[in-house]
Amino acid sequence: MISDEDYKKLLKQFHKLSDRHILVLETDMSSSDVQKVVVLSDKIRKAGNELVGLMRKHYDQLKRTKRYRKLLYLYGNTENKSIRKNLAIQLNDMQKQYNVTWDYCRTSMIPIGKKYGIDAIFALTKAEDIWRGIEKCLYDNGKTLHFSKYEDLPCIRAKQINRGIPMSVKDDKLQFKLGKTSFGIQVNDKFQTDEVNAVLDYLVKPETVDNKAINTLIEETYCIDTYRPCY
């Protein structure tokens, strides 16, 4: 018998290991509702640009310091693991000192999101996107953070089916809600029909499907397709 705590850990592990794929569907929104979505997306773009400007300022200050550049050089040219570990600690300390951290990025987005009237989950998701860009600059081959141009509208992502864009089932159909706007989807071919039906089947009995997924992971070290919606 698996305890509740172990069950949650295994389910989280399954979600990390399992494959993901994107299903693109059209909504049945009216043109006026589509315009509202465009307005929201532009607000997210503006909020993101404001956060990018703030984080780029701190990042530029950090990389201009001789000590940070020296530490980066030593870290990249040292093979000794213990020395690299010590250098990594020093680099992280400097990143904290100059507010180039995920925590600072996340908390800075809170007042910015409120300023533009953006739902907290959309603001958090945008902050995560920006932080991934910062990580590329810090640890990979990214050169600089970029602003989103006018009409370069970002996706509106909620990540969770009960926040931001709640998903529900009504009359055996997927229903969504964005703010006060409710809408469905258009299913145009057999592939989309099969995919949507698989999602509906999961939503009817999520615990049963999750249990099967966990048992398969434990017994066969294999991830089955559950069609759990995550967006």
Give the predicted meaning of each segment.
Residues 1-231:
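Nucleic-acid substrate recognition interfaces
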